[in-house]
């Protein structure tokens, strides 16, 4: 088993749970696997496929994901193919023939195609196992429900002797139970890996408005020169706006959302995978089909609807285990809009509860990683040291006067205003709505002029969290003072607020050289950083040339992590090259000579 792992995937050992899952599947038993993005889920069914007679059938929701997986497998010397509507009939006929002749080890197929072929092709194949990727799509409780997945419950009925492995990166308890029920899994063993992704830094910015977000995003990207990233937006129009803003600053960007034609979406994804653009501005429609290992950062322009969605989306960064950054912007406007969506949905109570948990993460004053892990049933008591709360623990001050000014303005407007007008009143802005409704004559008009608008939005989020007012979602989102708020307003209680730090994000990362960063334990001692950086760039150039020759994404030839290991250890023989983690026998023979020749020039 270890020899097969090394030969095809280039690894000397398994990650946690992988070996147990593989043995369980080889014993022809059903399994449900929960493992974070980048945690090594694919090997859990790919290795059993190589060790078993016949062909493994892998159900995948997106053609782009199939394409990426098949290219990666073929680049490792493994016979794999994808049966889908993007192929012409000649290609699909050839694939069917290869399956029936037992020449393919893995066949990727969509749920729709699987059902169409169930009584034809699949009956004529020797199937080693079924792997259901992105299995949360089968559950109505999952964050990405797809009706076509629900019909896959017939697999056990049609092929009772074939084991099924269902895999997902995010599923809470109710979703896990639903996956097992829908797929009719037979006494499955549930494998739950740690959801911790310690290489991802976690940062939240509250109360930023559009101009401030734009500046913060540009500053953030400036600290990641040339590094790939994704910006998730709530609306299609916002993806266009943000992409235009980036392009004006000379940052190559693409847009991806469901309103584009399939050809435009494919082009954006292809440009991103092949490093022709640095940034994709996308709605949540983007990313499930992305196996790009060197995405270095993810920004959420708006609050996501649930922790599951958020976790899966930030998981697209740092899949190779290298340090990567995530940034979430959070505003009251997001909360109001998402609450409306949840209220209008068919599962109001569940969706509101999920939104509330996401809100708790965004407003946390304790370790954010602890909150994420707790949501998925993992308990940890120690601080992570890699989130904004741990790096800069919040300090509190007596904010009673600030709170009283805001609550007084709400009261004097007869609790008939939302947050936007409230900030205008406090700041003394003569907006048309303020003057039309006579709010410029209120005693509190301009009472908070000394506090910047961004800080007011932050304080209002804190006040909402502290329970000083509520949002009447059924009354045009007007703010209503609670009993706790009344106590502060009339001086019966004090209000402690978190001090707002004015420095822009990333003082915490100042001085941290991110280029050519490798986990310390993998770096040989005494390696000159400048020389290592020069070699790394030369290796990247060679990798790009080889990838272009084969029309492959560069990371499929060799990952960034492998390049860092090569620049650190500098193998000068093909045998030493093959000993690097992540380089299997096939890649050693195919690429070893050219990479070793280049490395020798720097040795």
Regions found by a protein language model. Name each.
Residues 25, 221, 272, 362, ...:
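Short helix-to-turn junction characteristic of helix-turn-helix DNA-binding domains
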Residues 347-376:
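Short, charged low-complexity linear segments at domain edges
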């Amino acid at each position: 088993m270890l020899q097969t792992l090394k030969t095809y995937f280039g690894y000397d050992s398994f990650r946690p749970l992988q070996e147990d899952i593989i043995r369980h599947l080889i014993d022809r038993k059903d399994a449900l696997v929960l493992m974070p993005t980048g945690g090594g889920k694919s090997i859990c069914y790919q290795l059993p496929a190589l060790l078993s007679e016949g062909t493994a059938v892998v159900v995948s929701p997106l053609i782009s994901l199939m394409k990426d997986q098949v290219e990666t497998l073929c680049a490792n010397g493994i016979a794999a193919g994808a049966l889908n509507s993007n192929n012409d009939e000649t290609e699909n006929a050839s694939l069917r023939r290869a399956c029936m002749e037992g020449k393919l080890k893995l066949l990727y197929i969509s749920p729709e195609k699987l059902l169409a072929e169930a009584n034809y092709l699949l009956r004529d194949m020797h199937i080693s196992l079924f792997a259901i990727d992105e299995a949360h799509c089968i559950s109505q409780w999952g964050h990405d429900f797809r009706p076509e997945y629900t019909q896959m419950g017939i697999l056990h009925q049609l092929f009772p002797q074939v084991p099924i492995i269902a895999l997902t990166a995010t599923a809470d308890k109710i979703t896990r139970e639903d996956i097992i029920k829908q797929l009719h899994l037979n006494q499955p063993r549930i494998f739950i890996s740690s959801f911790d992704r310690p290489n991802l830094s976690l940062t939240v910015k509250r109360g930023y408005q559009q101009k401030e977000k734009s500046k913060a995003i540009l500053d953030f990207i400036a600290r990641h020169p040339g590094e790939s990233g994704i910006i998730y937006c709530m609306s299609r129009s916002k993806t266009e706006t943000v992409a235009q803003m980036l392009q004006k600053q000379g940052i190559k960007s693409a847009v991806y959302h469901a309103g584009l034609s399939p050809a435009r979406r494919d082009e954006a994804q292809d440009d991103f995978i092949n490093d022709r653009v640095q940034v994709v501005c996308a709605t949540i429609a983007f990313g499930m089909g992305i196996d790009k290992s060197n995405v270095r950062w993810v920004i959420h322009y708006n609050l996501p609807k649930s922790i599951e969605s958020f976790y899966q989306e930030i998981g697209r960064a740092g899949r190779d285990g290298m340090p990567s950054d995530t940034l979430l912007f959070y505003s009251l406007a997001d909360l109001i809009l998402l609450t409306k969506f949840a209220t209008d949905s068919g599962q109001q109570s569940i969706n509101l509860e999920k939104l509330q948990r996401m809100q708790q993460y965004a407003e946390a004053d304790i370790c954010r990683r602890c909150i994420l892990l707790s949501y998925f049933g993992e308990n940890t008591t120690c601080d992570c040291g890699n989130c904004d709360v741990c790096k800069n623990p919040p300090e509190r001050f007596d904010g009673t006067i600030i709170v009283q000014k805001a609550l007084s303005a709400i009261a004097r407007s007869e609790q008939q205003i939302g947050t936007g007008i409230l900030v205008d009143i406090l700041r003394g802005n003569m907006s048309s709505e303020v003057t039309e409704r006579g709010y410029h004559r209120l005693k509190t008009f301009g009472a908070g002029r000394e506090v910047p608008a961004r800080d007011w939005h932050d304080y209002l989020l804190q006040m909402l969290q502290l329970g000083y007012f509520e949002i009447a979602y059924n009354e045009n989102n007007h703010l209503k003072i609670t009993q706790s708020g009344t106590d502060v307003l009339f001086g019966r209680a004090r209000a402690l607020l978190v001090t707002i730090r004015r420095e822009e994000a990333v003082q915490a990362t100042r001085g941290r050289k991110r280029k050519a960063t490798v986990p310390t334990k993998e770096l040989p001692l005494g390696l000159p950083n400048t020389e290592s950086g020069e070699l790394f760039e030369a290796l990247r150039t060679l990798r790009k040339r080889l990838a272009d020759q084969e029309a492959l994404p560069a990371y499929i030839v060799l990952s960034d992590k492998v390049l860092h290991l090569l620049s650190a250890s500098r193998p000068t023989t093909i045998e030493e090259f093959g000993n690097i983690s992540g380089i299997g026998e096939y890649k050693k023979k195919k690429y070893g000579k050219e990479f070793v020749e280049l490395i020798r020039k720097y040795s």
